[in-house]
């Protein structure tokens, strides 16, 4: 009986598939084929999902760290009411800082909702912005210990202004490098106004810290309130 020839296993060839990133860039009427090729040829991860994920994680940690500076009173029952009242300024600084960090998270969520591609420059600008967010619990703790001291108010105001500046730079970098989808001109104007609110109020708060520290704190409170009035329509 004639033996059957041994069949050699068929080699399976895998073809490297290049993802089509053209769907993530601006419409063809705004972006030519050369711009799409220029973005696709960059040897760098282009998916913004990981950048957004680590940003959300940093915001969650920063919001949690704020409350760690508020210690519960450890006194007997007869002094508990006065001890709770004594912690009111610290609780107020916590609430203010929570609102400011929440405002920056909303602004970051809104801005990066337009971003479809990430390059090295935008990645590091986002990390610089996250650095300013992580420092905010420290600035808040100093302000809670010395709520009417000009150096503490200056530190807090400078931190808030740095948060706004780095986020604004990241936004305009993404728009200038065509890493975002097409943004209407009126929407760009709205974002520009929003990015100028918090640094302006923070700088004014720093300027009047030595003569009117309470007014400085009021200006800090106005940052999330004023920004909410110009919230995005998306």
What are these regions (language model features)?
Residues 14-234:
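Multi-pass alpha-helical transmembrane bundle typical of ion/small-solute transporters
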Residues 1-10:
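Extreme N-terminal basic, low-complexity initiation segments
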């Amino acid at each position: 009986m004639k033996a059957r020839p041994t069949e050699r296993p068929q080699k399976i060839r895998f073809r490297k598939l290049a993802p089509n990133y053209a769907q993530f860039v601006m419409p063809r009427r705004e972006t030519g084929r050369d711009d799409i090729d220029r973005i696709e040829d960059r040897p760098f991860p282009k998916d913004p999902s990981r950048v957004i994920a680590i940003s959300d994680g940093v915001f969650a940690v920063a919001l949690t760290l704020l409350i760690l500076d508020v210690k519960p009173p450890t006194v007997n029952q007869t002094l508990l009411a006065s001890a709770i009242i004594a912690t009111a300024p610290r609780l107020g600084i916590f609430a203010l800082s929570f609102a400011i960090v929440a405002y920056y998270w909303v602004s970051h969520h809104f801005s990066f909702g337009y971003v479809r591609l990430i390059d090295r420059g935008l990645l590091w600008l986002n990390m610089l912005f996250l650095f300013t967010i992580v420092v905010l619990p420290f600035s808040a703790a100093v302000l809670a210990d010395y709520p009417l001291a000009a150096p503490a108010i200056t530190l807090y105001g400078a931190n808030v202004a740095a948060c706004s500046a780095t986020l604004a730079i990241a936004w305009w970098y993404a728009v200038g490098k065509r890493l975002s989808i097409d943004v209407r001109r009126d929407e760009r104007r709205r974002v520009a106004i929003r990015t100028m609110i918090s640094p302006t109020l923070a700088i004014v708060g720093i300027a009047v810290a030595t003569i009117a520290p309470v007014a400085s704190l009021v200006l800090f409170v106005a940052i999330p309130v004023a920004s909410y009035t110009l919230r995005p329509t998306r």
